[in-house]
Swiss-Prot record:
It is found in: Cytoplasm. One of its GO terms (molecular function) is ATP binding. InterPro entries: ATP_PRibTrfase_cat, ATP_PRibTrfase_CS, ATP_PRibTrfase_HisG, ATP_PRibTrfase_HisG_short. Its EC number is 2.4.2.17. It catalyses: 1-(5-phospho-beta-D-ribosyl)-ATP + diphosphate = 5-phospho-alpha-D-ribose 1-diphosphate + ATP. PROSITE patterns: ATP_P_PHORIBOSYLTR. This is ATP phosphoribosyltransferase.
Length: 223
């Protein structure tokens, strides 16, 4: 029986994701997260499952191209990159919001106050383009790979769209959240071909993870 290969997200999601996988028997309880986080590829001899560790934005790429059978990443990542994958489970962890935020000094009260052709800094250009097009607002989207909240401070952008969990970072930088574009949480996705070839194995694993999520041991976030 071939092992199931899962792409796991490095960073803030990893700890909560590993907890769920341990509870579901997907990964051994004796596996140390600190040891695991330093590896790129890991095989769990007890469960016979294999894991790849990748940046959250790269997880869908590994799954779509068949390097991994399963993957776990945020809904925000899936929406931005639009990969052809089956989304199987909302793990209910890693909850955050993708929000439109503006400097307090601008005095904007709503999206309607944002001038045409304002510059919007974000790590999610595709989501942002669709959002503002849907609102009928013409903007210039500037893609950044991190520290998006810096953009208004140096006059690179008038508006930002960024992930916010608690709102603390926005507040520290005098940014006011104006509107939520999407609420995100960690999702389990599967490669379309793998789901057919390894259907029994993958279905059993998904069912176990679903049981843990529905048991209340992890907080459930609705789609």
């Amino acid at each position: 029986m071939k092992s199931v290969i899962t792409a796991l997200p490095k960073g803030r999601l990893m700890g909560e994701v590993i907890d769920i996988l341990k509870q579901s028997g997907f990964i051994s309880n004796n596996i140390d997260i600190n040891t695991l986080s330093r590896q790129l590829v890991f095989h769990d001899k007890k469960t016979r499952n294999s894991f790849l560790l990748a940046k959250p934005k790269d997880v869908p790429v590994y799954v779509e191209h068949g390097a991994a059978d399963l993957g776990i990443t945020g809904k925000d990542v899936l929406l931005e990159h639009g990969r052809n994958l089956y989304e199987m489970v909302d793990l209910g962890v890693g909850k955050c919001k993708l929000v439109v935020a503006v400097p307090e000094s601008k005095g904007y009260k709503s999206l309607a106050d944002i001038p045409e052709y304002s510059r919007v800094a974000t790590s999610y250009p595709e989501i942002v383009k669709k959002f503002f097009q849907g609102k009928g607002i013409q903007v210039e989207v500037i893609k950044l790979n991190g520290s998006v909240e810096l953009a208004p401070l140096v006059d690179l952008a008038d508006v930002i769209v960024d992930i916010s969990s608690t709102g603390t970072t926005l507040k520290k930088n005098n940014l006011i959240p104006m509107e939520t574009i999407v609420t995100s949480s960690a999702r389990l996705v599967v490669n379309n071909v793998s789901y057919k070839i390894k259907h029994k194995q993958i279905s059993e694993l998904i069912n176990k993870i679903n049981e843990v999520v529905k048991s209340g041991n992890t907080e459930i976030s609705r789609k």
